[in-house]
Amino acid sequence: MTDTDKTKAASSMWGGRFAGGPAAIMQRINASIDFDKRLYAQDIRGSKAHCRMLVKQQILTEADGALILDGLDKVLAEIEAGNFPFSHALEDIHMNVESRLAELIGEAAGRLHTARSRNDQVATDFRLWVRDAVDGMESALKELVTALLDRAEEHAATVMPGFTHLQTAQPVTFGHHMMAYVEMISRDRSRLADARRRLNECPLGSAALAGTSFPIDREATARDLGFAGPMRNSLDGVSDRDFALEFMSASAICAVHLSRLAEELVIWTSSQFRFVTLSDAFTTGSSIMPQKRNPDAAELIRAKTGRVIGDLNALLIVMKGLPLAYSKDMQDDKEPVFEVADTMELAIAAMTGMVRDMTVNVDILRAAAGAGFTTATDIADWCVRALKMPFRRAHHVAGSLVKLAEGKNCGLEDLTLAEMQAIEPGITEEARSVLSVESSVNSRTSLGGTAPVRVREAVAGARRRLMDEAP
């Protein structure tokens, strides 16, 4: 079939009231096949479910139904073999599939669209695609959580500096730091699961907007396609893309979490920190400076977060002014969703690889944990417990000790007892026991705290939750 023939074929699907064909520029702006061909598997799956329902309801004959199902299998095989003749003249994946089906089986192909519009067809395809994307992303995030848990368990007692304002604050453990991201990514997975429950309703049978006069069985097609049930309102079924927005929103929040971890990896791998070393598999060199090991994977994850957020904003702006029901604006819903899914797939896989393969430089972390008077809060807490001092006064005492040590260019643990007692006479030699970074982290035994015993409990709890998930 020539392009001219295909243009005529496309027009024949909707052009009965037109005297002429579309302009060339109209064909270009109207065609979506370059991107929506990614929906081919979902489109064919939806068409097969629709066909089976039409046969069951005696709207199609069994003979026509068998022809259509066999023809759709052949179309699917051609696409997956790379032999399918995609055509811009046929506008979109739906018309491309239907046109090829007609070439293969003849007039029966035209009966497939009974009781169906491209409006509910594409809404169904898109929900199926997003559902698959959610499942794939959720599975990838589970692998990332597992990688983080492995490193957290390995380094439950590895001391490192904790930061606020990127200034050393209090000692924590590397395992505790990894578990913070386990919690964040676990919430990302929960958001995706929530989004999946809401998107798992079937719009097929909504037709153009008002439903159909044919005696269809929407429950049957919903079950066939694995949906929880049909959407309750036909206008809503073809009009909204909140399921796509929710997927993108959950992805954007997850991307922010990945970006924050990526930023920390960039900082931690710098020559000024050297907290971790990324494997050669996730770094690159310089074309001029032979010594360089650049954390490019982490930097690219950080950059790609902006693309995910931008795509979410783009679709929000597309949808914000659309009256019910379908508008052609909604053809532009797919590219941002596809890009978000592709970007997240790459970012999650790269982050999982970096976390699994990175070397944690334990000695450097330990040395850095004690710098910057990170146990100052511990001496204040000791004053509260041992001297029954109000915390605000204890805070002032600890601050004065820090000022003294800073002036002497030494650590808190290097101050003599006499020097400490000059600031607070009640301080005894026992106070020194709280000044080591190991003592500091071991004392943080409150629920969710950084004590190694709590970190190990948190790891075990997270692993149990993963095991308890439904398959």
From Swiss-Prot:
UniProt-listed PROSITE patterns: FUMARATE_LYASES
Pathway: Amino-acid biosynthesis; L-arginine biosynthesis; L-arginine from L-ornithine and carbamoyl phosphate: step 3/3
Subcellular location: Cytoplasm
GO cellular component terms given for this protein: cytosol
InterPro entries: Arg_succ_lyase_C (IPR029419), Argininosuccinate_lyase (IPR009049), Fumarase/histidase_N (IPR024083), Fumarate_lyase_CS (IPR020557), Fumarate_lyase_fam (IPR000362), Fumarate_lyase_N (IPR022761), L-Aspartase-like (IPR008948)
GO MF annotation list: argininosuccinate lyase activity
BP GO annotations: arginine biosynthetic process via ornithine; L-arginine biosynthetic process
Protein keywords: Amino-acid biosynthesis, Arginine biosynthesis, Cytoplasm, Lyase
Catalytic activity reported: 2-(N(omega)-L-arginino)succinate = fumarate + L-arginine
The keyword Lyase appears for this protein: yes
EC number: 4.3.2.1
Main location class: cytoplasm
Family: Belongs to the lyase 1 family. Argininosuccinate lyase subfamily.
HAMAP family, per database record: Arg_succ_lyase
Name of protein: Argininosuccinate lyase
Organism from which the protein derives: Paramagnetospirillum magneticum (strain ATCC 700264 / AMB-1)
Organism lineage string: Bacteria, Pseudomonadati, Pseudomonadota, Alphaproteobacteria, Rhodospirillales
